[in-house]
Amino acid sequence: MDRDVTLNVDELVSKFKKEGHFDRLRKQILETVNEKESGPLLDRLKKIIDEEMVKDRTLKSKDQFRAAPLIAGAVDRSSLYEDSMEHIRSNVLSDQDLREVIYNSLEQIGIEQIEHEDEEKLLNSKTMDGRK
């Protein structure tokens, strides 16, 4: 990739984050996951916990600081995280509306960058004209 293009991409990413677009998208994705995807995830998590409670009846009598790591281990051994991430990737992150929001944000930043560069060129040319 050309060095100038790489610098422009890096600048674009930096501006995207600095202007709050990344945080806004992250919140939007989290809201979508909470609204649409959390039900099946919580049901599956509850099933894993119930199965672990059946396997080890002493979990109910243990304090939460001892029981929580055991249950977390059961969740880790399941494919809950991987399946959830794959589901989110294929159903939430690939959503066309989300892609349009990202594209429009990047496009706006790019337009602002071009306008800024044009202003700098104009100022530089005026400065150079004044020196001649």
Curated annotation (Swiss-Prot):
User: Which keywords annotate this record?
Assistant: Cytoplasm, Nucleus
GO cellular-component terms in the record? chromatin; cytosol; nucleus; Set1C/COMPASS complex
GO BP annotations, alphabetical order: transcription initiation-coupled chromatin remodeling
User: Does the record's keyword annotation contain Metal-binding?
Assistant: no
- Protein task: The Set1 complex specifically methylates 'Lys-4' of histone H3.
Listed under subunit, the entry gives:
Component of the Set1 complex composed of ash2, sdc1, set1, shg1, spp1, swd1, swd2 and swd3.
Q: What is this protein called?
A: Set1 complex component shg1
Q: Which organism is it from?
A: Schizosaccharomyces pombe (strain 972 / ATCC 24843) (Fission yeast)
